[in-house]
Amino acid sequence: MSCCGGSCGCGSGCKCGNGCGGCGMYPDMEKSATFSIVEGVAPVHNYGRVEEKAAGEGCKCGSNCTCDPCNC
């Protein structure tokens, strides 16, 4: 996820989210401070999937809060 200097956040479909005040793929969710602790759950083994997740985070904001390049 790209911070773009803290001024823009790309929303779903590589369209910039409303407000342009965030730093993330889904700006409407990034301000949430809620978290859950789950105990007693077995770890998930994701062998070979780390690269897939990292490759999909190529959204960067250009001028006027537009995504550039659009490859998210």
Curated annotation (Swiss-Prot):
Presence of the UniProt keyword Metal-binding in the record: yes
Superkingdom classification of source: Eukaryota
GO molecular function: metal ion binding
UniProt keyword terms in alphabetical order: Metal-binding, Metal-thiolate cluster
Family according to the record: Belongs to the metallothionein superfamily. Type 15 family.
Its job: Metallothioneins have a high content of cysteine residues that bind various heavy metals.
UniProt-recorded name of the protein: Metallothionein-like protein type 2
